Amino acid sequence: MLFLHSVVQGTGTLCTLAAWILLALVMTGCQSSTTSKFQLFSLATNVAQINVGYFNMCVLSANATLICKPQFTGCPGLTSISLTDVRSKFLINEVHPWMIVFSFCVCGVSFLMGVVSSLPLIGRLEFLRNIRISLSFFSFFSILVTALFAHVAVSSFVMAVGNGTQNRVTASLGKKAMIFLWCSMGLVTLTGITDSIILLVTSRTKKIRKTILEKSKVLTPSSSFSSKSSTTKY
């Protein structure tokens, strides 16, 4: 029973860690050449391509030169689109970058609570389990809202750019970032389910032990009385 409890709790903690890493990759998308493919959306022409993340942009020119910066005042081949305007108006008003930061922080706190609750002595405290379950479901809802806002807003923006530029600019959705967001939500959901199972099994086990202990206390006086009566007969 103890081994199964440890396996289930460890699985939940690892799921939270994986969700935390996925959120970090999405949040730091387009910060460098390593994370340049984790973009929310990309705009491309025959001359250049821009990948837009939550807090940065990466421009890939025709000669395969990659430049990543928080803002660009202009880009060869994309002169008809103000990239600063894309960042300031679209990202702030539609995607709400603070939501991914909030989800990342809540998921990180949930992971730390999972590590703390896995300790032998501290893990027995029931209120820590309740706090971790609450954090897991809170992380689920925050990531769900973040993913919905990002997916719907980016998809609408991509369609608007494709229809408004008369095929001069090709817009595409950042599939990896969206997949990471939805996968992190699924992992946090799995963590909440495992924590709920642990809490349910633990509470049921405590109730069974309590009833057994109460029955043993009730049976003890009667057994002692019967032993005394048997000795007086002899």
Curated annotation (Swiss-Prot):
Q: Which GO terms describe its biological process?
A: conjugation with cellular fusion; plasma membrane fusion involved in cytogamy; plasma membrane organization
Q: Does the keyword Cell membrane apply?
A: yes
- Compartments it resides in: Cell membrane; Cell tip
Q: Which UniProt keywords apply?
A: Cell membrane, Membrane, Signal, Transmembrane, Transmembrane helix
Q: Which GO terms describe its cellular component?
A: mating projection tip; mating projection tip membrane
Task: Describe the inactivation phenotype.
Answer: Leads to a defect in cell fusion trough defective membrane fusion and organization, as well as cell wall remodeling.
**Signal peptide position in this chain?**
1-32
Q: Which residue spans traverse the membrane? A: 97-117, 133-153, 179-199
Q: Which domain of life is it from?
A: Eukaryota
| Membrane topology field | Multi-pass membrane protein
Task: Respond yes or no to whether keyword Cell membrane is given for this record.
Answer: yes
Instruction: Output the Pfam families linked to this UniProt entry.
Output: Fig1
Q: What is this protein called?
A: Cell fusion protein dni1
> What is the organism of origin for this protein?
Schizosaccharomyces pombe (strain 972 / ATCC 24843)
Biological classification of the source: Eukaryota, Fungi, Dikarya, Ascomycota, Taphrinomycotina
The encoding gene is dni1
